[in-house]
């Protein structure tokens, strides 16, 4: 696939699975734009925008942001992008979001190319999230409001309840493949690439 062709990759997996890290590397190595709704929303919160003030309590509680807000953010990000070469990290999270994204991508002539699902045991996920917060604090950086054990466990539960239909959706379309998300960054990355072939 050349860099002038459309490529749409959707990373799935629970919070703390390493989606952001792996998506960043894949984006850099394959000239893709990484779209993280979480990063976009956190930026709005940090800047104190109207949207940021609207979603801050939702994010702090570990709940999912309403679909209409996320779809509008994605539509805005993809406007004018040709070819469409993107990685979605943290979106879609529900079947309704997947259907809305598919409709948007269909309008752009850029169907989903691959959907790697990173699988990591729950306790490993919790440990990673708490450690991420500890490391940020040790470096004197701002700690994400959701990088604590209680919120992390709630996010895992929300993920399981709301994302399973999404996994079924992409599996049914033959676009999903499972990746063992435990191991070194290079090991996991190599598994992702192998699954995309």
Swiss-Prot record:
Residues 131-147 are annotated as: LID. Its EC number is 2.7.4.3. GO terms for biological process: AMP salvage. Keywords: ATP-binding, Cytoplasm, Kinase, Nucleotide biosynthesis, Nucleotide-binding, Transferase. One of its GO terms (molecular function) is adenylate kinase activity. Its main location: cytoplasm. AMP binds at residues 37, 42, 63-65, 90-93, 97, 144, 155. ATP binds at residues 16-21, 132, 183. It is found in: Cytoplasm. GO terms for cellular component: cytoplasm. It catalyses: AMP + ATP = 2 ADP. Pathway: Purine metabolism; AMP biosynthesis via salvage pathway; AMP from ADP: step 1/1. Residues 36-65 are annotated as: NMP. InterPro entries: Adenyl_kin_sub, Adenylat/UMP-CMP_kin, Adenylat_kinase_CS, P-loop_NTPase. The keyword Cytoplasm applies. Monomer. Belongs to the adenylate kinase family. Catalyzes the reversible transfer of the terminal phosphate group between ATP and AMP. Plays an important role in cellular energy homeostasis and in adenine nucleotide metabolism. Consists of three domains, a large central CORE domain and two small peripheral domains, NMPbind and LID, which undergo movements during catalysis. The LID domain closes over the site of phosphoryl transfer upon ATP binding. Assembling and dissambling the active center during each catalytic cycle provides an effective means to prevent ATP hydrolysis. This is Adenylate kinase. It comes from Deinococcus deserti (strain DSM 17065 / CIP 109153 / LMG 22923 / VCD115).
